[in-house]
Amino acid sequence: KHERRKQIDKLCKIHCIFLPVVVCFYTQSQQALLLPKRRTEMSKKKKSGKKTALKVIGIILAVVVVFVGVYAALMAWTPAATTYSGEINPYITADAALVSAHRSGGGIMPENTMLAFESCMNSKDFNTDIFEFDLHITKDNKLILLHDDTLDRTTNAVEYFGYEDVKPIDHTYAELRELNFGENFQAEDGSYPYRGLRGDKIPDDLRAVLLEDVLDKLESHGKYSYIIEIKDGGENGMRGVDILYDVLKERGLLDRVIFGTFKGEVTEYVDEKHPDMLRSAGVSEVLKFYGAALLNLNLDEDSFKYDALQIPANQYRVVRLGTKKIVDYAHRYNIAVQYWTINDPDEIERLNDIGADAIISDTPDIAYKIIKE
């Protein structure tokens, strides 16, 4: 029995290696087949290019066939996963999925601005259960809300500072407060209602938002849960985690925040320095979970260091995470499943029906109507 378990674990690891390879080959082959036609002087290379594309497709099919064969064989004798017997994860919902405002509801108002938070908080048409937002550290060690690595897309930073790729780490919080964070927000009618606002004409709720300020604002209004992602990696990311931890602990919010990051070194730092923080699975952990779920492996209750999967429903048409099998397997191990970024009404309804615990959407108003009503 022990040897059988070891063999299963090895095959699971092999699958987790093959899966990214399949995705990579598939993506590259799609790009190769969709490339524009070469000019006349490149015509001699067309035939060899087609042959290469066919070879790539052949490799993909071969890998898939091998995986399917292994999977089918294992499913015949792999033991079923056990059921978690400890304290129930509060983020696992018994009925409908929770509604999470992605980037504070960036499809309704300018993302990650106080105006967006206020729009969700004060709405009489829908309620928000979870606020999702992203953080970057500034030059003076403040945490501000921003999704991208630079301020170029959402603000007038390029115009104001005179160069491109403006990053928060290169400027103080006071300097970033001079920017218009609603500059490039496009309303549903196609207009840009906040474009061109400068200086004193920029309202306070369209300026850079400090972590402490948004938490205090929300907590004064009601009791919410939060999904907070640190975007920085390396030392900046670790320093950002320390600041975030202190802010949350001071306000008694550690149990209402699920922390996330795409940086492996930051995940390891959280596990080592702040093990009492709730967190979502990292990229490699999601791949391992996916392999274990497909094989229905029987794992120990303490096999997972994370409390939630924050994942897309489908990735590259190959990795299908938005299935009832994935949700049920996660729930067996007391792991909540929260899907991003889901804006399509039909997909919202489908994921809610399979038991998703949260729908993270740019349009929480639409998600609420579908899920709650």
Predicted regions and their residues:
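Phosphate-group recognition and catalysis centered on beta-loop-alpha active-site segments
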Residues: 43-373
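Extreme N-terminal basic, low-complexity initiation segments
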Residues: 1-12
